[in-house]
Amino acid sequence: MSDDTPLAHSLPTPVAVLGDGCAALSLAAQADRLSDYALSVIAPAGTGSTQDHIWGFWQMPWLQDVLPLVRKTWSRWTIRNAETAVVMQAAEYPYHAVTRQHWMAHCMARATQHGVTFAEDRSSLDDVKQRHIFDSRPPKRHPDMMLQHFIGWEVRAAAGSFDDSTAILMDFRCDQTCGMHFIYCLPFSDREALVESTLFSPALVPDTFYETAISSWLNDCANVSDFEVIRREKWAIPLGLMARHDPALSGIGGNGGAIRPSSGYAFSFIQKQIATGIARVSAGNALGFVTPHRPIDLWMDRIFLSVLRHQPQHAPQIFTALAARLTGDEFALFLSGEATMALRAKVVSAMPPWPFLQALLRPEAGAKVGPP
């Protein structure tokens, strides 16, 4: 029977996703919106991460499916250094937190409900054309890449210890000797909060560096000296452009350019990438995924990363100046990849010019800024 017969056209096209991380399961959860495709997820047993951690994101149109699962929402957040504290307020785009395990369990349940198949070996790929295989395995990174690396403690303290109306996105009142370093604190209640020591640098540091920073911040800045650590998380996210895991296969998620190079934000951009791919199918195009980042944003990110690598001492002033210049909603739009040219100009005008002019003249700043 030829492929041109009506019966052949009525059969769903086999599609496979390699890996079972956030991108693979987020796509699988929406299999009901891809009725012309039969989706399978292929990952060897035991390869997926079992560590739970928090994914933060600003409310955007492509994240509606996540909203019922959020653990906490903040319309106010703070960015501060030793001299200045800026409180930002969002009217349209609040900041949310969802736990990895909660989201992944939700996606797995929906995927199973929608008939997605799961396999542990690649033998099921025999009937799948190469252009219909999407690889979500981690991309290849250069050993000298900038990293966002952190250790987080979820802590419990006495009632009234935390102000859960305001998230602390960046507090630079911590050791700045190893790169751009800040404390990130998400208060889930007046008793419980996630407190992370986050560092941007090419090299990891001993765990004691992060842990000392967390303890010191809790004691000296939050005035919380008596607390219990109820959960720990540890992660490192490569920053910049990376080659695909397998150049012969199309990528999705981090392997498809979804990680924001300057910030390491991935969760929101993975959902955006998948939403765009599904919209393309709805418009009559073949299923495929492209980077969710605009070329101009990738170029700006490359310049910004150069500043953070070579002149991290400017970071506290850069971020507090940016927070002071933008509204909360503008800040959310910019970091979510939804900036207009006017907003980008506003961001640039808030930056100290000399470090960025120096970064612009470095050879690395002129390198390729598009996806590999």
Residue ranges: model-predicted function:
Residues 74, 78, 101-117:
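N-terminal Rossmann-like dinucleotide/flavin-binding domain of flavoprotein oxidoreductases
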Residues 185, 190-191, 246-263:
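Short FAD-binding loop at a beta-strand-to-alpha-helix junction that anchors the flavin cofactor
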Residues 203-233, 247-250, 271-295:
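Flavin-binding catalytic cores
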Residues 177-180, 234-251, 307-313, 320-324:
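FAD-binding beta-loop-beta segment adjacent to the flavin cofactor pocket
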Residues 4-40:
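N-terminal Rossmann-like FAD-binding beta1-loop-alpha1 element of flavoenzymes
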Residues 20, 110-228, 240-245:
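Predominantly flavin-linked oxidoreductase catalytic cores and closely associated redox partners
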